[in-house]
A protein has these predicted regions:
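HhH-family (HhH-GPD) DNA N-glycosylase catalytic core used in base-excision repair
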Residues: 1-194
Length: 194
């Protein structure tokens, strides 16, 4: 169904939430190579586990402030006082385990950067730098492998479904639904420059 602006979008995009529409149109599925942005999306996807993405997206600005603009070095060094402040912050999701996982995952993220040169090089090596198009799934062999590897490295809240959503968000997977005005555009455009 066409929206008021004449475009067809993925069915999950909420036509009543401008933030969600902008996220769908301007971010989701567009390949990311910036490590800070990759860390931000990893943390947000981990917090989304068991919740709606819209809930997380609506709190994103507060997460940015609370988590020092997703600076992985700062997050990896959080003290118990900082963790307590996060657990008391009504503007973010205050799940104790997810907050602790953000610190644990920041440490593992930094270790991966040391090993691969960047987290971008790590995440994109799984597809040889190419965008993969697939829709209608919540996990895949790719997300299974990455999830298993990240868990082995000590990360938390990185099950295959979370990692699949992460890969979609950062554009490793192009999953815009057939009919969506963005379907396959990212893969065709970005793979032509690889």
């Amino acid at each position: 169904m066409k929206w008021a602006d004449g475009k067809i979008r993925c069915c999950w995009a909420n036509p009543r939430n401008e933030r969600y529409i902008r996220y769908h149109d301007e971010e989701w599925g567009i390949p990311v190579h910036d490590d800070r942005k990759l860390f931000e999306m990893l943390i947000l996807e981990c917090f989304q586990a068991g919740l709606s993405w819209e809930c997380v997206l609506n709190k994103r600005d507060a997460f940015r402030v609370a988590f020092d603009n997703f600076d992985s070095e700062k997050v990896s060094a959080y003290t118990e006082d900082k963790l307590e402040a996060l657990r008391s912050n009504p503007d973010i999701i205050r799940n104790r385990l997810k907050i602790q996982a953000a610190v644990t995952n920041a440490w593992a993220f930094l270790e991966i950067q040391k090993e691969y040169g960047s987290f971008s090089d790590y995440i994109w090596h799984w597809t040889d730098g190419k965008v993969v198009c697939e829709t209608g799934r919540t996990s895949s062999e790719l997300s299974d492998c990455i999830s298993k590897d990240l868990k082995k490295r000590g990360m938390k809240f990185v099950g295959t479904t979370v990692i699949y959503a992460y890969l979609q968000a950062v554009g490793v997977l192009c999953s815009h639904e057939q009919g969506c005005f963005l379907a396959n555009q990212e893969a065709e455009h970005y793979n032509s420059y690889s």
